[in-house]
Each structure stands twice: as C-alpha cells, then as structure tokens.
Amino acid sequence: NCKIPYIVFTIIIINIFFMDKNFFKITRVLDGGMGQELLSRGMKPKGTLWSATALLNDNYHNLLLNAHLDYIKAGAEVIVTNTFATRRIRLIENKVEDKFEYLNTKAGEIAKKTKDDYPNILIAGGLPPQNSTYKADDRSEDIIKDDFYNQAKLINPYIDFFYFDVLSSIKEINVATQSIEEFNKPYLIGVHISEGTELPSGEKISELLNKLKNKKLLGVILSCVSP
C-alpha cells in the first residue's frame, strides 16, 4: 500500500475556475491518508471497504468528520472526500453496490460539514481509479468514462474541485477528465509512478505533461510512488 502523505507540489499551472487562480502557485498541503487514520481511531473495517466502512456504518460518521477536522487543525488547506473506496467495483466486491449513491453522497456531505467551522477550507472531490489500483485500466473508454462520471456527479455538489487520485495511464487520465466536463469545475491530477519516471502503463510522466492542455487543469502531483 502507498502511504506517502499528500504533500502537493505543482508541476503545471494553467487557469483556475471558481478558485483563486494563484492557489497552487506555492506549495500547498492536502490532508493525509484516511484509511489508516480511521483504523487508528477505532474503526473496524468491513471486508475490503477500508475507509468506506466509516460511511456505511453511521456510528462512524462523527469519527470521519473529526478526522477531517483534525487534518485541518494540523495544517491541511485542502481535504479530500472519503471516496477512494466508494468506487462501484469495490462495492460490488463487498456486495453493497446498492449503497453506491448513498456512500458517495454521504462522503460529500461529511466533508462539506467541515466548512461550518472552516469556511475557507477547500474540498477536493476524490475520484480514484475505477478498476484496480496501481494498474492501468484496460477496459473500454466508454465503460471507464461512465464509471468516473457516475461517481463524480454524486460528489459534485459538495466540492470545490475534482482530484483524480492515483491514476496509472494517459488513457485513463484523458477519459477521466472528459467525464467531468459538464460540471465545469477545475481538477487536479494525481498520478502513480511505479518505475522511476514511468506510470504503471509504461508511459513516461514527461509524455503526460506534454499532452495536458486544459484551462481547468490545476496541476499534476505524484500522489503515490512505488519503491
């Protein structure tokens, strides 16, 4: 598992919508990993749902909210919705696909509640790989796009920008960014580097940077680096 903290450094800055366009021109701090944090606070995970257990079990809702708040108190300027494990495929694996809408919506609601006390905090809508983590998604583009869109539309009302978390190929990134076009929000891309300067797909990060041209792009970060 990748356990590096989410410290943001910007590689590309273009234009920003609905946010201060200079926000990522300096180093910023995002919150840390949520799964391990919730475990340390007493959450008992269900199957492979990991951090999504805190959404499925309403006894853990305050635990999740307090984790968000404590990251803010520790200096986080951006928090990420607890949606890494609420992708449809993970819910299917755990026989709770019928909770897809509820879990993603609840994650957005809990994240947004932090603005009651911290109105200036930014909320990133976390959109994880829609198939396996740390591997390039070789499914059809239409299927990948639908999966990203269906999760994005549920968290869209609660967020300031989208954050694509640990994507593994240029194809996946292109499809993911296309999936959110109708929401007209900026986005940050988090990539997984597996071999030096390469994505798990074998493509170099320089290839990705040369192809990224979108006025809603906030930047690119290395959200996970394999040893």
Predicted feature locations:
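Domain-level signal for soluble alpha/beta catalytic cores
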Residues: 18-227
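Generic detector of N-terminal low-structure segments
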Residues: 11-14, 19
